[in-house]
């Protein structure tokens, strides 16, 4: 992550972030929210869904045992962040606050005990749930529905937690707007995303969230169609140039499936291609299902950019 955060979202672009040049990185390790993370590549946020109806794994990690196994694998594969969610993002059975807390809090308590130094994120749009999760040990609030609960920044500030500020285009939680429009200009969605997430990031800082703990997320598929998602991928550098660290949540999403015309189980290659492009443009974190494959892609991108040395030499490299 950036060692010196931006004074404001509108400041001039640091040289290291200009255009598509090499993103900032530290040798070996860095920290985020007080936890150790990789410093020589973009960061990996591993998804662990405590839901029976997740769009991707269909409840594969709903049980405690399966979820714990998923955490062990993710940590072994190199995840920097474990992102724990208790409600399916899309439409589905209603989940009240108490149920969401019951799914999340005991598991986060276990996770904090099992991995004391692991950066833990909670995926929720409800401030009440975020508060309980942070009290249980979460370090980062992944507010995927773009600040629909205005108390979220205050919760992050209260616990010294980080906050992800996402763009949803005004979509309400667990809805799929039809025929979304961002005006007639080619850059309409890009400008809208940048305007919303940078304003949200500044509000978070004003509420007391440490500037270096704030990330922005264009939130592919949330209040956007596939054409919007592809345009945002072409303009990742514009997001990076705001100075805020950029989180990309691309893993197995409809933007990949619709672009390639493939089913949910065949989206890995498209996800990794989009990941490589976004990482090369300077995105700093990726929320993913496949940790090991993503890590290899991000390490290769970092090595091409010259911020990570090769792991081994077989051709006489010095």
UniProtKB/Swiss-Prot annotation:
Segments passing through the bilayer: none
Segments forming domain Pterin-binding: 42-299
InterPro entries reported for this sequence: DHP_synth-like, DHP_synth_dom, Dihydropteroate_synth-like_sf, Pterin-binding_dom
Function, in words: Has very low affinity for the DHPS substrate 6-hydroxymethyl-7,8-dihydropterin-pyrophosphate, but can bind the inhibitor dapsone. Seems to lack dihydropteroate synthase activity, and does probably not function in folate metabolism.
NCBIfam families: DHPS (TIGR01496)
Family of the protein in this entry: Belongs to the DHPS family.
Protein name: Inactive dihydropteroate synthase 2
Species of origin: Mycobacterium tuberculosis (strain ATCC 25618 / H37Rv)
Lineage: Bacteria, Bacillati, Actinomycetota, Actinomycetes, Mycobacteriales
